[in-house]
Each structure stands twice: as structure tokens, then as C-alpha cells.
Amino acid sequence: MTSEYVMELFYNAMKVALIIASPLLLAALISGLIISILQAATQVNEQTLSFIPKIISVLGVISILGPWMLGVMLDYMHNLFNNIILIIK
């Protein structure tokens, strides 16, 4: 197992993690931004008000994109397990 192969494994793991986390982070960012704009417009300065919409939006994204996220993780793990001989060498 060479250092290039280790770096490739690390790169692929980080890429998969970023692909899986991006929709969740984007949903939380957009819902937080919308709630913040509404709070600024109505002058409501309650900091805990944005947590519930963020949680609901993230859970919605998980329920919609959950099978796709699981498929991406399973493809990556399937690839790792198929190439375990190359990793052990």
C-alpha cells in the first residue's frame, strides 16, 4: 500500500462525506437565512426561534434524500470492501 493509494482513499472518503453532508448543510443554511431575514424585518430578537425550522428542514431533506445518501455510502463501502486486498498489501 503506497502513500498515493492512502491519499486517494482519504480523498474519496472526504468527497463522499462532502457529497452526503452538502444537502443537509444547504437546507440548514437556507432555512436559517430566511428565518434571520424575517426576524430582522419584524425586529424579533429571539435566538432560539431559528432552531425548529432548521431541524424540520434537515429532517425533510433526510426523508427525501435519505435513500440517495444511503446509496452513495453503500457504493463507497462496496468499493472499499471489493478492494480490501489492495488496501492490505
UniProtKB/Swiss-Prot annotation:
<dbReference type="InterPro" id="IPR002191">
    <property type="entry name" value="Bac_export_3"/>
</dbReference>
<keyword id="KW-0472">Membrane</keyword>
<keyword id="KW-1003">Cell membrane</keyword>
<comment type="similarity">
    <text>Belongs to the FliQ/MopD/SpaQ family.</text>
</comment>
<dbReference type="GO" id="GO:0009425">
    <property type="term" value="C:bacterial-type flagellum basal body"/>
</dbReference>
<comment type="function">
    <text>Role in flagellar biosynthesis.</text>
</comment>
<keyword id="KW-1133">Transmembrane helix</keyword>
<feature type="transmembrane region" description="Helical">
    <location>
        <begin position="55"/>
        <end position="75"/>
    </location>
</feature>
<protein>
    <recommendedName>
        <fullName>Flagellar biosynthetic protein FliQ</fullName>
    </recommendedName>
</protein>
<dbReference type="GO" id="GO:0044780">
    <property type="term" value="P:bacterial-type flagellum assembly"/>
</dbReference>
<dbReference type="Pfam" id="PF01313">
    <property type="entry name" value="Bac_export_3"/>
</dbReference>
<keyword id="KW-0812">Transmembrane</keyword>
<dbReference type="InterPro" id="IPR006305">
    <property type="entry name" value="FliQ"/>
</dbReference>
<dbReference type="GO" id="GO:0005886">
    <property type="term" value="C:plasma membrane"/>
</dbReference>
<keyword id="KW-0975">Bacterial flagellum</keyword>
<dbReference type="GO" id="GO:0009306">
    <property type="term" value="P:protein secretion"/>
</dbReference>
<feature type="transmembrane region" description="Helical">
    <location>
        <begin position="18"/>
        <end position="38"/>
    </location>
</feature>
